[in-house]
Amino acid sequence: MQNKLLEKMFEMSRWENLIEKADLKGIDKGVLRQMCKPEVRLAIYQAIKNEQIEFMPSHMAQIPKDTPGEYRTVFVGENVDRCIQSLINDCLFELFPEMVHPSCKSYQVGLGTGKTVKELSTILAHTTTEIVGVKSDFHHYFDVVNLDAIMAVFDVIEEKLGFAKCTEPVMNLLRKTWNNNLVFDLDGNLIEQYCGIRQGNAIGSFLADVILYELDDFMSKKYKFYCRYSDDCITIHNNPDEVICDMNNIICKYGVSLNPKKVQILYRNEWFKFLGFNLKGNQITLSKSRVKSFQKEVEARTIKQRNITPRRALNQVNSYLYKGDGQYSWATSVLPIINVEKDVDTLNEFVMDCLRACSTKKTKIGGLGSVNDKEDYTILRGTGKNVTANRNKTDKEIDGYLSIRCMQNALLTRRAVYDTLVRCM
C-alpha cells in the first residue's frame, strides 16, 4: 500500500529546502553533508518504513520569553532527529490542513498575521461597549496536554492515510516517541518526565494547532471574533466570565487550563498586545518587543559597526527595511498593517539619527521605547546627547534614503510602485 506521507517526506525538493533551513538553524554541517547523499536518505526511508528507527531522548533547554526573567523550557533533539521531525511536521500541515481550524493562526507557512490583526481592529472600531473582549493564555499548554489527546491525533492521521490502527510507520514512530518519557534535564541527567506536546520538537507545532480544534470551532461560531495563536487567545465579547467559562469547559477535557495571571480584560480605550502588534480601536502599531527588535536590527547595521562608512550603513539599512529577500522585508510585513502615523515617524526619526551618526561618528543617540498610556501613539524616542549636534552637522534629507512614511504610502498605493522605488535604491 502506498504511503503518501512517507513518500512526500522524501521528495527531493523537500530535502533541499530542509538542508537549507537546517543550516540556518545551526545544525552541524557534517550531518547535513551526510544527508545530501542518496544512500543516507534511502537508509532513513527504509528504517522508518520498516519501523527500525526511534528518536533519541531530547535535551531540556531554556529560552527567554518576552517578559524579562521568564524562561520557557523546550526539548531539543539530536541533529538527525530534528531534521526528520521537521520533515514530518511540514508534511502534516500540507496533507491535513483541514485538521487546523481557520481561527487558529500559528505555525503555518505563508499565513501572515496582518490580515487577522486588521480584521480585529475593524471589529474593535465598531464596538461601543466599555469592555470589548478577553485575552487569555493557557497555563503551560505545551507541558500539560494529556497523552490521550495526542494519541487521538495520530489515530486520526492514520485513518486519513487509509491505514488500520497502529500500522502506519510514521505514526508508530511518533507513538513510540510520545510514549517514551526519558529526557535529559538541564544538568545533562537522564530522567523520566512527562513532556506533553514537547515544545522544541517540530511536530509539536502541528499538535499544538490541531488538539484544540474543538475549542476553536465552538468559540468562532459563538462569538463575534475569536482567534488563537498557539496558547494565546483573543475573544471579542462584553462578558468576560461567559468567555472564560466556555473555554474552561472545553480545554479541561485535554488537561489544559487558563493561566489566571494572564487573563486580560480588554477595554475600548486601552491599548493591548496581540500577534506582535498593539491595538486600540482602529489604531494598530508595533508591540514593545517588535520596537526593541527594530532598534537592535537598525543599530546592528549602523552605529554598532565600528568605522562603518555612511554609504555602507545606508545600503544595509535599505536592505533590511525595504529590499529584504526580494519578496519579503521588514516594510512589506509591517507597513501595510500599522496605521499610527506618529509612531511611523518616530521609527523613521530613529533610523535617520543612526545614519547621521555614521557620518559624524558621534553615536550617543538614545533609543526607542513603548508605552500604553498615550491616546494616539505608543512609541517614544529617547534622545541621546549627540542627536541635536548630529542633526545640525548633516543635511535634513539623507541622499539615497526614502522615509518609512514614503514607502508605506507607496505600498498602500500599489506594490508595483513600492518595487520600483526599491529597484532605484
Task: Name each model-derived stretch.
Residues 56-58, 228-231, 261:
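Short Gly/Ser/Thr- and Asp/Glu-enriched loop/turn motifs at secondary-structure junctions
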Residues 47-69, 171-187:
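Reverse-transcriptase-like RNA-dependent polymerase core
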Residues 70-100, 192-220:
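Conserved pre-motif C helix in the palm subdomain of viral-like polymerases
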Residues 82, 86, 192, 260, ...:
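Right-hand nucleic-acid polymerase module
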Residues 1-58, 64:
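A structured, charge-rich N-terminal accessory region that forms the first stable segment of a protein
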Residues 2, 85, 89-146:
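Active-site-proximal segment of RNA-dependent polymerases
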Residues 123-230, 234-250, 254-256, 266-271, ...:
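Conserved polymerase palm-domain catalytic core
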